[in-house]
Amino acid sequence: MKTVGIVIPIYNVEKYLRECLESVINQTYVNLEIILVNDGSTDENSLNIAKEYALKDKRITLFDKENGGLSSARNTGIEFFYKEYETHFSNEIDGFYTFTVANENPQNVYKIYKNKNTFIEKNLEAPDIDYLIFLDSDNSWELNCIEECVKRMQDIDILWFDHLCVYEKGIEDKGQKTRMQIFSYKEECIINPKDYAKRALEVGSRDISFSWGGMIDFNFLKKIKLKFVNYIINEDIHFGMILFASANKIYVLPKRLYKCLLRSNSISNHDKKVTKANISHYFKNIYEAFNEDAKSAKEYLRLASRVITVLKLIDFFQGKKENENSKAIKEIFLPFYAKKALKFKKVNKDPLNLKNELDKIKPFVKNILPYDAWKILQKIKNIFS
């Protein structure tokens, strides 16, 4: 039976966490290794709820760490499964054995909790897993999500499924389509990255982000040594583009197996309200550089994240031996994001000193049509087809 590793970042989600975790521990597929990563939550109960479930279900390992953002939390789980952590027993408390990271600790993990009844000896070792999947802690799965994925993962690098958007009260439902709907995949199929790039071109989309939208073959992920870029937003663009550029087979599963909650006080901040609560601890220096003007700091972070993302992608493509799949991904997607990154030149204050890096990006910008133009051309094409 294949083993599925699950990584769930947790940050101030006491209102949503139980529903999320119930959808995990009650999956019809049971051979799971569940990693909860408390990313420095400051609310009253997120960590306590995580501990409650870690005692309830022996498949759960709980990491408590410094606030570092979504990328850092996910990377904690990835690094654990990559077996990069050497752990030492710390103590026994409240039904747990606790451990610390004894070697390099890039995500600043404070403590690792595991139900003491799991152990014969006081040693915590990372399990071997076959597949990896992410879940955000304010979202949830259909109870057959993992089962539906696993039975399709044979010789597949990435499985991509559809999701259902659930709007929290006060958030406007604008009837937005999911990427699966935009790409018009209605039947299950296996594609390659070149096929994906071609379909993106046809529908006028440049969305290649990937994090919680499917399952990844773990040996494939480990082979390409991919992690998320820390301390940026929209981190799933970099992750997704490298993932797809490195893959051979992608399974398209147009089933809505994931429930995505759109709420205001989150990293993605779908209702565009910006408050001090949206600026996380790890953005503190930027926040202070803008005299605690949350709106300006968040706008700078948004633009800076684009630049950092594209610079990392350029490094990747320049260091990769090109094939027709990676070439298609690079040529269709990189110019679009490079062009967006160059909008950074309009910023007046630059605490990260990124303006000097823009010259590295300019050669990758081509004459590309804006997204609206692609939609218009597609409509014209449909009229005359």
Model-predicted regions and their roles:
Residues I156, N323-S385:
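Membrane-interface aromatic/basic loop that binds lipid-linked glycans or pyrophosphate carriers
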Residues I237-A245, V307-L311, P335-K339:
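P-loop NTPase catalytic cores that bind/hydrolyze ATP
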